[in-house]
């Protein structure tokens, strides 16, 4: 991107990608410089405003907040562009601790995103979860010792549950390559990115040796000499397949206060069109129920396989909880794992700036700050629930 920028800094897509690359690497100041060039040359690029908002501190400068508010007045904007600006504005008001305005904007953002994906259907998700359970209902897994060093480690759970923090901690180990959120398993088990299992992923058709070798080769592309760490949270759907294909793989389930998780999901805009359930309150609640039910199923089928990592314990007692994580992964202790902020692994997450900071406790019980502004379905339902 740097070479292309030096040749021609008038290319819109190049500028977006260049700014994005800086953000992934944690170089937010250079990202902002590129995004300011984008704003000047391509003022109607709405994505650039969202990217800028993710790394800008609106306590210090509200000029860009005003620019976005003026952009939002354009009635010709698509639902997607309106949503993008609304989520960016929500973040700006969060910086200013104006939670009422922040709530107002991310509710509007979700409404516009749901209009963008007007064909979103939670019933497809329900059918997929039922199919996965039916595949493994009668299957009896072999008991195998997991004393060897794994080739693969998976961090699973709901989005916004703490998977990025855990990823940065474990990938600080010298033997681990933090690959971020990989699409490898999703692509292996679903038909053309649809919510339907591939025929060769069904147990009756599954050639374990051939299938595992094929998938492992896709992981090893990233670093064949290291343990590959995949933090795609929705891999919780594939725990049965993971253990069947890779019995030595380590699976870590991040367990966070469900009310905080639901809030964090609802107040953020995701890149993936596969996460359309996040933009509708009833769909979000239903997906959480599906997730909890499937995790309960896996724990019954594989009682000693999954490591339960409590997010609140991790942020309150980082050293002891980190040592437990490293021990579970059959790795020797390294002091690097305590200070994950020195980890230069690229990060793609909706909370880029937070992921580069030391462990912070401000996200614990965050839902309490928003309940008064969000007297809607999510909290009528979730306030009654326990963690899991």
What is each model feature region?
Residues 38, 52-53, 65-80, 86-153, ...:
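PAPS-dependent sulfotransferases, especially Golgi type II membrane carbohydrate sulfotransferases
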Residues 143-246, 254-255:
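Phosphate-binding active sites in nucleotide-utilizing proteins
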Residues 242-267, 325:
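Conserved phosphate-donor/acceptor-positioning beta-strand/loop module used by diverse small-molecule
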